[in-house]
Each structure stands twice: as C-alpha cells, then as structure tokens.
Swiss-Prot record:
It is a multi-pass membrane protein. The gene is Gper1. Keywords: Acetylation, Apoptosis, Cell cycle, Cell membrane, Cell projection, Cytoplasm, Cytoplasmic vesicle, Cytoskeleton, Differentiation, Disulfide bond, Endoplasmic reticulum, Endosome, G-protein coupled receptor, Glycoprotein, Golgi apparatus, Immunity, Inflammatory response, Innate immunity, Membrane, Mitochondrion, Neurogenesis, Nucleus, Postsynaptic cell membrane, Receptor, Synapse, Transducer, Transmembrane, Transmembrane helix, Ubl conjugation. The modification N-acetylmethionine is found at residue 1. Ubiquitinated; ubiquitination occurs at the plasma membrane and leads to proteasome-mediated degradation. It comes from the Eukaryota. Expressed in the brain. Expressed in neurons of the hippocampus, hypothalamic paraventricular nucleus (PVN), supraoptic nucleus (SON) and the median eminence. Expressed in magnocellular neurosecretory cells (MNCs) which secrete oxytocin but not in MNCs which secrete vasopressin. Expressed in glial cells. Expressed in the nucleus ambiguous. Expressed in epithelial cells, in pachytene spermatocytes (PS) (at protein level). Expressed strongly in vascular endothelial cells and poorly in vascular smooth muscle cells (VSMC). GO terms for cellular component: axon; axon terminus; cytoplasm; cytoplasmic vesicle membrane; dendrite; dendritic shaft; dendritic spine head; dendritic spine membrane. The chain crosses the membrane at residues 63-84, 97-120, 133-153, 176-194, 221-236, 260-280, 307-327. This is G-protein coupled estrogen receptor 1. GO terms for biological process: adenylate cyclase-activating G protein-coupled receptor signaling pathway; apoptotic chromosome condensation; cell differentiation; cellular response to estradiol stimulus; cellular response to glucose stimulus; cellular response to mineralocorticoid stimulus; cellular response to peptide hormone stimulus; cellular response to tumor necrosis factor. Disulfide bonds join 130-207. G-protein coupled estrogen receptor that binds to 17-beta-estradiol (E2) with high affinity, leading to rapid and transient activation of numerous intracellular signaling pathways. Stimulates cAMP production, calcium mobilization and tyrosine kinase Src inducing the release of heparin-bound epidermal growth factor (HB-EGF) and subsequent transactivation of the epidermal growth factor receptor (EGFR), activating downstream signaling pathways such as PI3K/Akt and ERK/MAPK. Belongs to the G-protein coupled receptor 1 family.
C-alpha cells in the first residue's frame, strides 16, 4: 500500500496560484474564505484550460475576427466616410454624427490588427507599445460613447423639443458639437495619462492600461454615466413617441433615424459590456498595498478572457457600418449613386448595381425625398 502524506490524509488541496494578502488580524477561516473567493472569481473563466489550449482558442478567435469582421469594419467605415463626403451637400445632421463615429471606429479597427494577435498578452510587457495601444483604445471608446450619448440627446430634442430647438439644431452647431466631443475624448484620455505618467515615470514596466485610477475613470466616464444619460434620453423619447402617436403620428423619416441610432447604441452596449465587466471585476478584487501596476495586471492573470473581451469591443467598430448600411436608406441611395458615378463601364456598372441590390435591400422611398433636409 502506497504511503500517503498528511495532506492527503485530511484531504487538503495545495493552492499554487497567486496568493492574496491577508490582514494581520485575519483568522484561518477568513484566510480560507479569501482563497475560495479567489478561485471562484468571475474573471477566472479559463482555470481548467492549459496554456496551449488557451493559445489555440485565442488564435482561432483571432482568425475569425481577421477573416470576417476586420474587412467589414475597415472597408465599411472607409465607405461611410468617402460616400458621405462625396455628397456633402446632401449631408444631414445625423449623417455628420455618423461620419465622426465612423472615423473613430476606423482608428480602432486599424489598431485592432496589433491587438488581435496579442495572444499571450506579451505586448503589455512593452511599456511604449502598451501605452500607445491603450491611448488609441480609450480615445476611440470615449469618442464613440460621447457621440452616441450626444446623438441620443439630439434625437430627444428633435422629437420632443422640435419647435424650441429648431434654431439651434443646424449643421454649424452640429460641426461645433463634433469638435467639442473630439476635444473632450482626447482630454479624457491625455489628462489622466499625464497625471499617472508623472507619478510612475521611474517604473520601467509602466503601462497606462493597468493603472487602477485610469480603469475606474474608464468604467465610470466611458460606460456607466453615458449609458445612464442614454437610458434617460430614450425613456423621454418613448414618452414623446406615445404622445406623437396619439395626436398626429411620427414622420417615417424620424422613426428610421431613431431606429438606426437605437440599434447602434444597443450594439455598442453589448460589445463593450464584457470589457467593462472584466475591468470592474479586477477593480473590486483586493490589491496588495505597494504593488506596481505591473504586478496588478489582470490581463496577465487571465489572458484568454482579456483577449475575448477585447475582440468583443473591436467587433463593435466592425458592426456599425452594417447597421448604417441596412438601416440608413439615405446612405444606400448615396452608395448606389456613388457606384454609378465611379463605374464608367456599363458591364461593371450593372455588376456593381446587382451586387448592391443583392446585399443591401432596396429603399421604399424615392431618393429625392430621402435627400431632403433631415430633422
């Protein structure tokens, strides 16, 4: 009969993972509870997988993203910019906001090629590269969510306060709003970066993405507060829609613009929710006093989970052009007209029109009606 160790006799399992610090006055029961919480933490989704299995899964997901989503996001956002700029005289106020949203998404899609094959999260060991990618990611995130928040507020003004705000809802004020939103997005990223960089300037492995204060700001300013405002706007919009339906009904054009903005907001929420939950779980866990950001990096602890939530966030920038193409009838007509102008050969012209007709459904309204000034 084989000899057993004392640990085996009492059924004790030895925990080899990272050890959490225990308070000086902690009891054995409290220490065991903290270890149990660590093992059952929500972020620990891949504890039963080997490093090789996690690498294979991450590589497979990265290939799927690169083959299917990246071309849609890259080409789609460029088309939104090129087509709308080509017909700038027919550009509406919602189109102007969507152009800026497409520019922000295009930045992230281009940056995603670096991040998408960061399979073992080793890019975060390079301080300059980690900080560079984090800055681009945050600027895109802030600009996207700020534009969506402002677009929701603009829809509320167009539906509920049309008479009072008609003089202020002009293209000039829309361009000014876009400029202010970009300034706010850059400031919300660079001001915290400057502050924490001065404090951690002597740390060789400093990474902007791993600073807890920056992560709290990202979750609060980039997710919780904007979506609270968006939720309030849409609750007021629903009330305005009920009133409009009772009295005179709502113009079809306003309904379509509202439906498209709501779809973009919903996709943004679904794609960015895992990233913010992942960061929040890390922030709510205990941190050892005096630890540097390198030692607190949650992306090193859960590389596969971090990779999955990053891919989900990048997917938002790839799906927005699809929503804009299928729900934006004005853009579909502009795209057909743009293709007709750029394809001089009759055979190529017919092929492009047939392809567009097969991929993008026909509009139900005439083009001259859709190109009229928007609300």
């Amino acid at each position: 009969m084989a000899a057993t160790t004392p640990a085996q006799d009492v059924g004790v399992e030895i925990y080899l993972g990272p050890v959490w610090p225990a308070p000086s006055n902690s009891t054995p029961l409290a220490l065991n509870l903290s270890l149990a919480l660590r093992e059952d933490a929500p972020g620990n989704l891949t504890g039963d997988l080997s490093e090789h299995q996690q690498y294979v899964i991450a590589l497979f997901l990265s290939c799927l993203y690169t083959i299917f989503l990246f071309p849609i996001g890259f080409v789609g956002n460029i088309l939104i910019l090129v087509v709308n700029i080509s017909f700038r005289e027919k550009m509406t106020i919602p189109d102007l906001y969507f152009i800026n949203l497409a520019a922000a998404d295009l930045i992230l899609v281009a940056d995603s090629l670096i991040e998408v094959f960061n399979l073992d999260e080793q890019y975060y060991d390079i301080a300059v590269l980690c900080t560079f990618m984090s800055l681009f990611l945050q600027i895109n995130m802030y600009s996207s969510v700020f534009f969506l928040t402002w677009m929701s507020f603009d829809r509320y003004l167009a539906l509920a306060k049309a008479m009072r705000c008609g003089l202020f809802r002009t293209k000039h004020h829309a361009r000014l709003s876009c400029g202010l939103i970009w300034m706010a997005s850059v400031s919300a990223t660079l001001v915290p970066f400057t502050a924490v960089h001065l404090r951690h300037t002597e740390e060789a492995c400093f990474c902007f993405a791993d600073v807890r204060e920056v992560q709290w700001l990202e979750v609060t300013l980039g997710f919780i507060v904007p979506f609270a405002i968006i939720g309030l706007c849409y609750s007021l919009i629903v009330r305005a829609l009920i009133r409009a339906h009772r009295h005179r009904g709502l113009r079809p054009r306003r309904q379509k613009a509202l439906r498209m903005i709501f779809a973009v907001v919903l996709v943004f929420f679904i794609c960015w929710l895992p990233e913010n939950v992942f960061i929040s779980v890390h922030l709510l866990q205990w941190a050892q006093p005096g630890d540097t950001p390198c030692k607190q990096s949650f992306r090193h602890a859960y590389p596969l989970t971090g990779h999955i939530v990053n891919l989900a966030a990048f997917s938002n920038s790839c799906l927005s052009p699809l929503i804009y193409s299928f729900l934006g009838e004005t853009f579909r007509d502009k795209l057909r007209l743009y293709v007709a102008q750029k394809t001089s050969l009759p055979a190529l012209n017919r092929f492009c029109h047939a392809t567009l007709k097969a991929v993008i459904p026909d509009s139900t309204e005439q083009s001259d009606v859709k190109f009229s000034s928007a609300v």
